[in-house]
Amino acid sequence: MRHTYACAMRWADMDALNHVNNVAYADYLREARLAYAEEAGVRARPMTALAIDYRAPLVFRPEPVLVTTTVEDDVLVQEISDRREDGTTTVYVQARTTLADGAPPAPLRPDEALTGRLPVAGRARDLGVDGDVDQVATLELLQEARVAYATVVGARGLPWVVVRSETTFVRPLPRRATYAVHAGIGKIGRSSFEIVAQLVDDAQVFASSRNVMIGFDPEAGRARPLTDGERTQLEPHVVAG
């Protein structure tokens, strides 16, 4: 089944560049999932994993953006795009959402190699109707930690963009005044590097993420190689594996 949903945009969805914030994309995907579940007459299920590829920036406008959803067993394949009258299409996001199948999650212990420690303050609006942190809000907590960690490793303020985000939701996250995120640097490529993180509470992992960042040349509008200086800043924080 293929479902198409016209998702309204909000000014609050924008980032400092007037592009849709990465977490807002996840909100659009959720709106489309709920619309699909209602139309198909199936129960909306929580996510266990979400992988997002960011293909192009989306700027604010009053018209909605289209979200298509295709079902593959317990996986929803989704795409956020515009289709024009001349037949051309601009794809902004491609995503794969794995839905919970009812099996209890396997416990996951914190990775001691992730030596970055980032406290993130909670807010009441982070909570869902069940009293736990909403899954999209979980992405926002991880995003806050990622931005803070970029400062720790000396990458804050440099021209980077996130091109891929992988998040695993291990267990429901209870309300806390402050959440602990452990972070480190994953693979370093020619023009990219990874930030890996775990959202931890009481020696348990509640969510984990891996984000691929690329160096970006804003004048040329394309990826750029990492400089020797940037590699020198990142390499001490690389985690094994």
Residues of each region from the PLM?
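Ordered, small/hydrophobic-rich secondary-structure cores
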Residues: 1-97, 178-180
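Preference for bulky hydrophobic residues occupying beta-strand positions
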Residues: 7-9, 27, 52, 69, ...
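Structured core of small recognition/catalytic domains
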Residues: 131-220
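Short, well-ordered turn and helix-capping elements at secondary-structure junctions
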Residues: 11, 54-58, 124-126, 165-171
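HotDog/MaoC-like acyl-thioester-processing domains
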Residues: 54-64, 70-118, 173-175, 186-241
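A generic structural signal for short, non-catalytic loop/turn and secondary-structure boundary residues
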Residues: 2, 45-47, 111-113, 160, ...
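Catalytic strand-loop segment that frames the active site of acyl-thioester-processing enzymes
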Residues: 1-35, 39, 103-154
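Residues that recognize and position ribonucleotide moieties
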Residues: 18, 45, 131, 160, ...
